[in-house]
Swiss-Prot record:
Keyword annotations: Cytoplasm, Lipid biosynthesis, Lipid metabolism, NAD, NADP, Nucleotide-binding, Oxidoreductase, Phospholipid biosynthesis, Phospholipid metabolism
Enzyme Commission no: 1.1.1.94
Catalytic activity: sn-glycerol 3-phosphate + NAD(+) = dihydroxyacetone phosphate + NADH + H(+); sn-glycerol 3-phosphate + NADP(+) = dihydroxyacetone phosphate + NADPH + H(+)
Any one GO BP annotation for this protein: glycerol-3-phosphate biosynthetic process
Pathway in which the depicted protein is active: Membrane lipid metabolism; glycerophospholipid metabolism
EC top class, as a word: oxidoreductase
Record-linked SUPFAM superfamilies: 6-phosphogluconate dehydrogenase C-terminal domain-like (SSF48179), NAD(P)-binding Rossmann-fold domains (SSF51735)
Family: Belongs to the NAD-dependent glycerol-3-phosphate dehydrogenase family.
Name of protein: Glycerol-3-phosphate dehydrogenase [NAD(P)+]
Record carries keyword Nucleotide-binding: yes
Subcellular localization(s) per the UniProt record: Cytoplasm
GO molecular function, one term: NAD binding
Length: 349
């Protein structure tokens, strides 16, 4: 696929993807809600606040005019944070070109409705529009994609023809793209791993070691899988790029906002202080609240998520939270996953 691509948003991820698409020969128009940001990028070819040091091709245009950005676009990339997705999706609807493929790259759960991003889009645009909807997710820090460091991601859609369109749109020698029909699993994996990354950051802040982080990541993946299966995901998806892949990179990377915020909390900072230090959106904070409610709604045990919620919002000491996790009642490693699978008829106990 070639032609015009509208990228809605001008954060780090939207900027990195705009650069990638431009280098592939697409006509890229970015939409920003900030006149100062649009002017800076157009004049300096750099997004100094969100992706410093990465120079953008001269033919990328940044506009404040949403209608202009979307005019005759063959593909539309929604590159805004999850809490802003509904509003931007709603505003874009009158200007969406007929038959344009729609790509969402936000990783989160809407806190008020508990909807995944595809559900938010369907509510705003109608179920029929999901035929054009594709989610892109996986272990992909903008700081590395913007420097052409080899990266692999996954795109998911109920319409595999659309998924393959997006695969062709983004795929290049430094950015490998796989397809997957499991929209539920890909969206949940990308959202829920941010909670566990907060936890591994807290462990780092407390001075714990690799054993602790490995335990959090492994048992965190079990929580993600349990909830995902009950919500209709294919459990195999969580063994892929949007599951364990994204979990690893977000829990271990110096680029991870969620890990950095967690580390500050582990070192004794308040949530507000930690968010101020990171200076960018930390998706895991909102997702923690949403995931806790989802676990209650679906009667799924998520002990790590529960303790992180208590640390973030109920004043529990991080050290006490670790103690509560370590002194839980004993259980079989596979028992909880098997119970979740049995609830959705995947396997028999």
């Amino acid at each position: 696929m070639s032609g015009k691509v509208a990228v809605l948003g001008a954060g780090s991820w939207a900027t990195a993807l705009s650069r990638l698409l431009s280098k592939k020969g697409c006509q890229v128009v970015m939409w920003s809600a900030s006149s100062e940001q649009a002017r800076e990028i157009n004049e300096t070819r750099e997004n100094r606040h969100y992706l410093p040091g990465v120079m953008l091709p001269a033919d990328i245009e940044v506009t404040l005019d949403l209608e202009k950005a979307l005019y005759k676009a063959k593909a539309v990339v929604y590159g805004v944070p999850s809490h802003a997705f509904r509003e931007v999706a709603r505003r874009s609807l009158p200007y969406l070109p007929e038959n344009a493929v729609l790509v969402n790259v936000a990783k989160g759960i809407e806190e008020e409705s508990l909807y995944r991003m595809s559900q938010v889009f369907a509510e705003e645009a109608g179920l029929s529009m999901l035929d054009r909807y594709v989610v892109l997710s996986g272990p992909s820090h903008a700081e590395e994609v913007g420097r052409d460091i080899p990266t692999a991601v996954v795109v998911a859609s109920p319409n595999m023809e659309r998924a393959e369109q997006v695969q062709d749109l983004f795929m290049c020698e430094s950015f490998r793209v796989y397809t997957n029909p499991d929209v539920v699993g890909v969206e949940l994996g990308g959202a829920l791993k941010n909670i566990i990354a907060l936890g591994t950051g807290i462990a780092d802040g407390l001075g714990f070691g690799d054993n602790t982080k490995a335990a959090l990541m492994t048992r965190g993946l079990a929580e993600i899988s349990r909830l995902g299966m009950v919500m209709g995901a294919n459990p195999l998806t969580f063994a892929g790029l949007s599951g364990v892949g994204d979990l690893i990179v977000t829990c271990t990377s110096m680029h991870s906002r969620n890990r950095r915020a967690g580390m500050a909390i582990g070192q004794g900072k308040s949530l507000e202080e930690a968010l101020s230090m990171v200076k960018m959106v930390v998706e895991g904070v909102r997702t923690t609240r949403a995931a806790r409610r989802l676990s209650e709604k679906h009667a799924v045990q998520m002990p790590i998520t529960e303790q992180i919620h208590r640390v973030l919002f109920e004043g529990l000491s991080p050290a006490v939270a670790v103690n509560k996790l370590m002194t839980r009642g004993k259980t079989h490693e596979m028992e909880e996953v098997a119970l979740a699978a049995a609830m959705v008829g995947k396997i028999k106990l």
